[in-house]
Amino acid sequence: MIPRKAFLTKGTGVHKDRLASFELALRDAKIEKYNLVSVSSILPPNCKLVTREEGLSELKPGAIVHCVLARNDTNEPHRLMASAIGTAVPVNEDNYGYISEHHSFGEEEIIAGEYAEDLAATMLATTLGIEFNAEMAWHEREQVYKASGHIFDTFHICQTAAGDKNGKWTTVVAAMVFVTSKC
């Protein structure tokens, strides 16, 4: 079973119960109808990245759906949290890419998102044998990766939120969702 399509999504939920908060975050991301199975970090060869709407149109409620899921939650008022998915796509579509998940506290959306993107790009770069200086800033390494001719694109999706002011559970999710076959 190799996914032929994938899409990114994100969401936030707030509720007095932790599990219900997670459910509401999945609803916000539009993936609550599926039995989600978390998988690791490989973007399959020739897997087409599509819009959330296109991907969802091929799934049916109750389907077992694989995804790379980043999840974070808190009931601490005003605590900033993030969940991010980073993706690195190789030039040669017959090769696999990388997907990373990152969840953190205290990071703004751009910081958490770029961290996840950097992580995915670095994992792909090391498997392709691209030489780079790990001490370089992400934007400098990004240029090295793309100039190598092996990495076509990198991107991320990130959801941030501050914990509910009244101490309700707040959950953030970000996911790369795979579509294996039309349900």
UniProtKB/Swiss-Prot annotation:
Its cofactor is pyruvate. This is Pyruvoyl-dependent arginine decarboxylase 2. Binds 1 pyruvoyl group covalently per subunit. Pfam families: PvlArgDC (PF01862). GO terms for molecular function: arginine decarboxylase activity. One of its GO terms (biological process) is arginine catabolic process. The gene is pdaD2. NCBIfam families: pyruvoyl-dependent arginine decarboxylase. It is an enzyme of class 4 (lyase). The record marks S40, S41 as: Cleavage (non-hydrolytic). Its EC number is 4.1.1.19.
